[in-house]
């Protein structure tokens, strides 16, 4: 299959490209200069779409700029999907995010949800919605790994927020399996093999990656006054919006994901070993 992979240089995209190529697909991964979703060039985009059987959109950004999120997650994919339909592309696979919804008040999930709906209105679209993704090189994952080294974890609400992290290898395997399936217009949550609190997740990483005993966890009661600064310094990575996402939790039923993989997705305590083995 000829596949145009958007976001192929990103964290998830790199793993998707490797897995899809290993499955025998011809994968085109345009650079930002060749295809920039912040300012689409129609001629360049149509050239990239020509001759493709499928498009996989793995573009996702965190930003404090809501307009930028709307452009990259919603308007650009909608336009590309229309051009893809005109080019005869048969299907589109959208890598979204768990909880994405057009009406979500958090700009990241709202823009993702609106993009999902806009693309699906144009052509047959499978949507996958990963939970918090673990994998070396991912910005949020590396932040968690650095935090896990600390002997004292000072976390919002004491780290009681519930997560169900998924390994990027499982995300890549799931995308490859979905493209190989005959179904169209599937919506699939991708969550890992075990749900646990943020504090427990960090201590799991601490044990499996750093070989250390559990850290002491204390609540962080006075973060709110500093959120405008952390939002600016992290470009949206640490903000009131991300804290709300944490508070809402990131867990989902993974029975359909398990069926697609043909096995249970990895649990957090298995992540480090999977890193050693690789794909």
Regions found by a protein language model. Name each.
Residues 1-23:
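N-terminal Rossmann NAD(P)H-binding glycine-rich loop of SDR-like oxidoreductase domains
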Residues 37-79, 83-86, 98-102:
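NAD(P)H-binding glycine-rich loop region in Rossmannoid oxidoreductase-like domains
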Residues 96, 117-137, 146:
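Conserved beta-loop-beta element that borders a ligand/cofactor-binding pocket
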Residues 131-163:
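NAD(P)-dependent short-chain dehydrogenase/reductase
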Residues 139-140, 158-180, 186-189:
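Substrate-positioning beta->alpha
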Residues 162-169, 188-208, 217-228, 264-267:
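Substrate-binding strand-loop-helix patch
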Residues 205-249:
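Terminal hydrophobic/aromatic helix or amphipathic segment near a protein terminus
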Residues 248-279:
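Amphipathic terminal alpha-helices
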């Amino acid at each position: 299959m000829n596949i145009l992979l958007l976001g192929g240089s990103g964290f998830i995209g790199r793993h998707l490209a490797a897995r899809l190529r290993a499955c025998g697909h011809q994968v085109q991964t345009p650079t930002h200069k060749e295809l920039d979703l912040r300012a689409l060039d129609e001629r360049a985009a149509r050239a990239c779409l020509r001759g493709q059987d499928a498009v996989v959109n793995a573009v996702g950004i965190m930003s404090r700029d809501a307009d930028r999120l709307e452009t990259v997650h919603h308007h650009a994919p909608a336009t590309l999907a229309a051009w893809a339909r005109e080019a005869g592309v048969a299907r589109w696979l959208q890598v979204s995010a768990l909880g994405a919804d057009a009406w979500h008040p958090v700009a990241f999930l709202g823009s993702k949800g609106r993009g999902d709906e806009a693309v699906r209105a144009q052509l047959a679209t499978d949507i996958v919605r990963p939970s918090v993704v673990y994998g070396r090189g991912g910005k949020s994952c590396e932040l968690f790994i650095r935090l896990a080294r600390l002997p004292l974890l000072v976390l919002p609400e004491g780290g009681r927020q519930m997560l169900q992290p998924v390994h990027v290898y499982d995300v890549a395997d799931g995308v490859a399996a979905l493209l190989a399936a005959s179904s169209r217009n599937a919506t699939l949550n991708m969550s890992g093999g075990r749900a646990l609190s943020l504090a427990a997740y960090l201590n799991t990483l601490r044990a499996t990656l750093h070989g250390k005993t559990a850290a002491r966890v204390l609540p962080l009661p006075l973060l709110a006054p500093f959120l405008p600064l952390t939002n600016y310094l992290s470009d949206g990575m640490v903000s009131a919006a991300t804290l709300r996402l944490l508070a809402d939790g990131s867990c989902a039923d993974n029975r359909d994901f398990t069926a697609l993989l043909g096995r249970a997705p990895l649990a957090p305590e298995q992540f480090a070993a999977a890193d050693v083995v690789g794909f």
